[in-house]
Amino acid sequence: MTATLSNFLWSIFWGGVVVALGAAALTAISRIDRIR
């Protein structure tokens, strides 16, 4: 595996992590707003 390919895969991995965290945060916020 070349360094470029490795960096590309890591960028995709962290991109997915960020998106997942963002979605989880939005879901939590929407649930909190509904409780109120």
Swiss-Prot record:
One of its GO terms (biological process) is photosynthesis. It is found in: Cell inner membrane. GO terms for cellular component: photosystem II; plasma membrane. It is a single-pass membrane protein. Disulfide bonds: none annotated. Its main location: membrane. The chain crosses the membrane at residues 9-29. Keywords: Cell inner membrane, Cell membrane, Membrane, Photosynthesis, Photosystem II, Transmembrane, Transmembrane helix. InterPro entries: PSII_PsbX, PSII_PsbX_type_1_subfam. The keyword Transmembrane applies. Belongs to the PsbX family. Type 1 subfamily. PSII is composed of 1 copy each of membrane proteins PsbA, PsbB, PsbC, PsbD, PsbE, PsbF, PsbH, PsbI, PsbJ, PsbK, PsbL, PsbM, PsbT, PsbX, Psb30/Ycf12, peripheral proteins PsbO, CyanoQ (PsbQ), PsbU, PsbV and a large number of cofactors. It forms dimeric complexes. Involved in the binding and/or turnover of quinones at the Q(B) site of photosystem II (PSII). PSII is a light-driven water plastoquinone oxidoreductase, using light energy to abstract electrons from H(2)O, generating a proton gradient subsequently used for ATP formation. HAMAP family: PSII_PsbX_1. This is Photosystem II reaction center protein X. The lineage of its organism: Bacteria, Bacillati, Cyanobacteriota, Cyanophyceae, Gloeobacterales.
